[in-house]
Amino acid sequence: MASNNFRLQYLKIENYKNIKCVEFDFSNKNGVTLLIGNNGCGKSNILEALSSIFAGLYQSRLHKPDFDYIIRYSINNNIVEISLSGSSYSISVNNKSFSKTEFSVRKDCLPKNVIACYSGESQRLWEKYYWPYYSNYISTIKKSVTIPELPMIYINRYNIEIALLTLFFYDFDTFEDIREFCANTLKIKHIQDITLHYNPKKIREWNDNAVLQMVKMLNDVDGVPVLSADKITLSLDELKSKLSYMGERELFKVLYAATMPKDDKVITSIELNLELNNGDLISCSDLSEGEKK
């Protein structure tokens, strides 16, 4: 059965590192899969293979998988099945065949993003599958009128502030599952205040895209030249009010764009003061490395 949301149904991988031939049937699962095994058995290789598959589907000029696979998933009421054998793709959407070129323009048949979060020390996943997309993204973002899409997103502990802000940007009365996750899993009751630090020099070098529009809205100014302060502190309610024109995905996208360019950051750092369930007040920097991961 097809659905609007992306749902992985079947995956077969052949001859990728120590994976000679493995099949997964996800069709009767609830959307969350846990892989359990000894060190060195290939768990991380499964994540790498999935990343390789979609990296090759988004832009083959940036990456080409070097193994055979079959993947089937549902998205936007479509059933998509893709197989790669050698260098030859076979693609069908609702049992209708498409060439790789034809499929590439079907924006409704690929997930908007593949997001990876890896807590290990190895940088292989990032460097091989996510860095090429990130590098391409960063090279254009500063002068772009609109924020470009980044299909392959790699999250690590340095994105913890963005991740927490995005979660608490949701309306907890509507999204009860997110409220319960923040309260029961993260043990965080509330974000007490948020401080954004800017780089005024870099701000003036950027095009007037969504990143600068956000900065202007937060500071209640009409133009960047009149921006005098290099930081602003707001409550969570103030942030939500000033950025009410944004959805949660847009907030994440804009904050990611503002904070990630190594040499061109508009927002150089984000400080969060958190109220825990037990009433303690801590800063985000007080979280241990394990908690951030």
Model segments located where?
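Pre-Walker A-like glycine/lysine-rich segment at the N-terminus of P-loop NTPase domains
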Residues: 2-48
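Extended helical coiled-coil dimerization/tether regions that scaffold
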Residues: 2-4, 27, 155, 163-293
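Short, well-ordered loop/turn elements at secondary-structure boundaries
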Residues: 5-7, 29-31, 40-41, 65-67, ...
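Short, solvent-exposed loop/turn segments at secondary-structure junctions
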Residues: 16-18, 29-31, 40-41, 76-78, ...
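Short catalytic/ligand-binding loop motif for oxyanion handling, primarily in non-cytosolic enzymes
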Residues: 20, 44, 55, 80, ...
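Conserved P-loop NTP-binding catalytic core
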Residues: 29, 47-101, 109
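Electropositive, glycine-dotted interaction segments
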Residues: 90-215
